[in-house]
């Protein structure tokens, strides 16, 4: 599809915003979902200091800014800052005029109704888009894997959801949310590295720990056995060079960190692990469709990128499910961006073109149109 009239696809996550053009196979812009404001107004005269910074620029100037994440646990909580992020997305990252392109936005499962209306209102009234649509993130991930029925375990920076989907429709009564995701794992890794004698406390150091997590952590197939191996040999140790040249060694922390996904008690949480949450979601569904869900369990989001996570999910869910059940965990290599990719696929389908909410429909019905057209 031509960039000229291509739809824009914007996936706003708690940690990162992914944006680009429908028909592309990957997002053109990926930047942190943060808005920063100067802590001290006008320290430097004539610097042309802005009153707010978004994304990477906010990240790089974080020393002089107060940073805010407008999306908490997948749900927008600060609309003024959210508007700034969208403005930055259209004008600075994609360099397009939003009034010339249809816009596909994504939303968290179980997003409050008022929130979808607010998104719709901002798109039509602030950005004057000709058409828009709001799709549920997990459903897009399932489309990206080439399916319309299955259960998606979507885990990002701020929240994890298990979403059973049948023939393209999410089943709201069976969706479960777990407030344990990437940011919590980064914090936990900071904590256990401190126990080893390395001190990471500031927000800048948190970014370093996030990098350590992304490069060195993995999920053990058998946690107890892995702990024993780590204790008896140094075969699992890896070294990491900090920005100042200091080299640190990390051993059992490599798999203790993501183990919290399966044992939230590590973080002092009483919730079920991701395997049990997935199983519980399936059990809330009609008995006739469970077989299809077990055989189509799709992982999605950055926090599912750990090596070993699919094998471990397979093992854990097999232990919970009926013994004759066929269980298949699908972990597509591009799952970090599969929500965006699903949006790109959906928005470029010829059959989808009549699904858009047009400016005209919005003007006739107001923001509540979103509940009738997007489900």
Curated annotation (Swiss-Prot):
Gene3D superfamilies: 3.30.420.40, Actin, Chain A, domain 4. PROSITE patterns: ACTINS_1 (PS00406), ACTINS_2 (PS00432), ACTINS_ACT_LIKE (PS01132). Its EC number is 3.6.4.-. GO terms for cellular component: cytoskeleton; dense body; focal adhesion; plasma membrane. It is found in: Cytoplasm, Cytoskeleton. The modification N-acetylmethionine is found at residue 1. It is an enzyme of class 3 (hydrolase). The keyword Aminoacyl-tRNA synthetase does not apply. The modification Tele-methylhistidine is found at residue 73. Coiled coil: none annotated. Its main location: cytoplasm. Pfam families: Actin (PF00022). Polymerization of globular actin (G-actin) leads to a structural filament (F-actin) in the form of a two-stranded helix. Each actin can bind to 4 others. In vertebrates 3 main groups of actin isoforms, alpha, beta and gamma have been identified. The alpha actins are found in muscle tissues and are a major constituent of the contractile apparatus. The beta and gamma actins coexist in most cell types as components of the cytoskeleton and as mediators of internal cell motility. Belongs to the actin family. This is Actin, cytoplasmic 2. It comes from Triakis scyllium.
């Amino acid at each position: 599809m031509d960039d000229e009239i291509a739809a824009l696809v914007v996936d706003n996550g708690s940690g990162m915003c992914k944006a680009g053009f429908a028909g592309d196979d990957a997002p053109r812009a990926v930047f942190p979902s943060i808005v920063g404001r100067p802590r001290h107004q006008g320290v430097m005269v004539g610097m042309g200091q802005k009153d707010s910074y978004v994304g990477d620029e906010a990240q790089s100037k974080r020393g002089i800014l107060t940073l805010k994440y407008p999306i908490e646990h997948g749900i927008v909580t600060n609309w003024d800052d959210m508007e700034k992020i969208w403005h930055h997305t259209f004008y600075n990252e994609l360099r397009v005029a939003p009034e010339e392109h249809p816009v596909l936005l994504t939303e968290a499962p179980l997003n409050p109704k008022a929130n979808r209306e607010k998104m719709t209102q901002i798109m039509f009234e602030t950005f004057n888009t000709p058409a828009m649509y709001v799709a549920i993130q997990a459903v897009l991930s399932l489309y990206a894997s080439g399916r319309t029925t299955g259960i998606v375990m979507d885990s990002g920076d701020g929240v994890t959801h298990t979403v059973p989907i049948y023939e393209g429709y999410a089943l709201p009564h069976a969706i479960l949310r777990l407030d344990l995701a990437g940011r919590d794992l980064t914090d936990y890794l900071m904590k256990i590295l401190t126990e080893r004698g390395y001190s990471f406390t500031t927000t800048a150091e948190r970014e370093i720990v996030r990098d350590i997590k992304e490069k060195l952590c993995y999920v053990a197939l058998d946690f107890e056995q892995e702990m024993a191996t780590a204790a008896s040999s140094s075969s699992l140790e890896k070294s990491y060079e900090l920005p100042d040249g200091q080299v640190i060694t990390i051993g059992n922390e490599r798999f203790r960190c993501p183990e919290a996904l399966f044992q939230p008690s590590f973080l002092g949480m009483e919730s079920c692990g991701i395997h049990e949450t997935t199983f519980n979601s399936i059990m809330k569904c009609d008995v006739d469709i469970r077989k299809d869900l077990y055989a189509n369990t799709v992982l999605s989001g950055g926090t599912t990128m750990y090596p070993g996570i699919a094998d471990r999910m397979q093992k854990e869910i097999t232990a919970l499910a009926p013994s004759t059940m066929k269980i298949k965990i699908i972990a597509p290599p591009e799952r970090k961006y599969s929500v965006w990719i699903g949006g790109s696929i959906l928005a470029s389908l010829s059959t989808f073109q009549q699904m858009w909410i047009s400016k005209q429909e919005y003007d006739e019905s107001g923001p509540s149109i979103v509940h009738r057209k997007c489900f």
